[in-house]
């Protein structure tokens, strides 16, 4: 089975093509360009290099959040455009689960660059908790704790101070990865009292191969959705939406593709319309999709 993986939930845009459990090709870029500029050309390059085409795909696995609202929509829009055009099912993959997959087979501490904490005596029987942390701004992170590849509890947006306090009560060993590591590395090193470490640079950020591998597992289990039913998971509402609710502002009118047609829309719709359109009528009928796709 052939699966395309896409992750544009953070600063890195990444796509990968896997066949069964073999990674045929992976392309990641963190070069300061917007994902709308880089993602589709990267996908085209992967198919060109491997001699495959979109029509060969059994499914497209997409990072469905949490993460950058705009980035998530660009990934979803790209996947939906391809899926609608070729009749391919989609697979929703948690961004945090994808990050945890980066280090799922590496044996914990041995895969890391630093280990610290007051309680440094660890044994093979000590539980290793993997904590993907993504910068959610305002001293918060998107995170979840994974034990043996399984989410423990729920994914959440939480203050970094509260997260550190909770982890200190847990014991065991703790591995951190994600784009919030460079932001809060020093804070964690200062405030954690348990054994902890950080993932090595090649595994620190999102990788589409991890998304695709999880997607392959879900495909075999029949866990696919149509383009129409695909949903992104933001965990928390955009700041504009929260401010609107706090101030009691009512919904307002915006224009979509047809300036003569107005409809009531929430701030979510406004952001989607201004940043990147997703779903049916995603705009792909007006864009040039490379012929080799």
Predicted regions and their residues:
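DPxDG-like acidic metal-binding loop motif
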Residues: 63-95
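Glycine-rich phosphate-binding/hydrolytic loop that grips phosphoryl groups
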Residues: 201-232
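N-terminal beta-alpha supersecondary unit
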Residues: 1-64, 278, 293
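Stable alpha-helical structural segments in soluble proteins, enriched in small hydrophobic residues
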Residues: 46-50, 85, 103, 208-219
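Surface "functional belts" at beta-alpha junctions
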Residues: 22, 89-205, 234, 257, ...
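Residues at secondary-structure transition points
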Residues: 30-38, 69, 73, 77, ...
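A short, charged, Gly/Pro-tolerant segment at domain boundaries
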Residues: 228-242
């Amino acid at each position: 089975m052939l699966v395309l993986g896409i992750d544009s939930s953070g600063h890195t845009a990444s796509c990968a093509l896997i066949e069964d459990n073999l990674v045929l090709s992976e392309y990641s870029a963190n070069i300061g360009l917007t994902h709308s500029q880089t993602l589709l050309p990267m996908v085209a390059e992967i198919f060109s290099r491997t001699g495959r085409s979109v029509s060969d795909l059994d499914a497209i696995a997409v990072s469905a959040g949490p993460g950058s609202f705009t980035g998530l929509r660009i990934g979803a829009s790209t996947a939906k455009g391809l899926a609608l055009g070729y009749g391919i099912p989609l697979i929703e993959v948690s961004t945090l689960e994808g990050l945890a997959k980066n280090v799922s087979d590496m044996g914990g501490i041995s895969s890391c660059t630093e280990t610290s904490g007051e309680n440094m005596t660890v044994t093979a029987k000590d539980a290793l908790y993997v904590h993907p942390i993504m910068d959610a701004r305002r001293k918060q992170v998107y995170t979840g704790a994974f034990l043996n590849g399984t989410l423990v509890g729920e994914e959440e947006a939480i203050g970094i101070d509260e997260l550190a306090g909770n982890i200190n009560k847990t014991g065991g060993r703790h591995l951190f990865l994600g784009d919030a590591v460079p932001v809060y590395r020093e804070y964690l090193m200062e405030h954690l009292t348990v054994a902890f470490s950080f993932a090595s640079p090649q595994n620190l950020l999102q990788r589409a191969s991890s998304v695709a591998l999880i997607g392959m597992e879900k495909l075999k289990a029949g866990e696919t959705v149509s383009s129409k039913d695909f949903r992104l998971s933001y965990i928390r509402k955009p700041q504009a939406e929260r401010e609107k609710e706090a101030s009691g502002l009512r919904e307002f009118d915006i224009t979509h593709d047809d300036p003569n047609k107005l409809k009531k829309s929430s701030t979510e719709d406004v952001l989607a319309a201004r940043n990147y359109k997703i779903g049916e009528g995603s705009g792909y009928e007006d864009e040039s999709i490379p012929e080799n796709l």
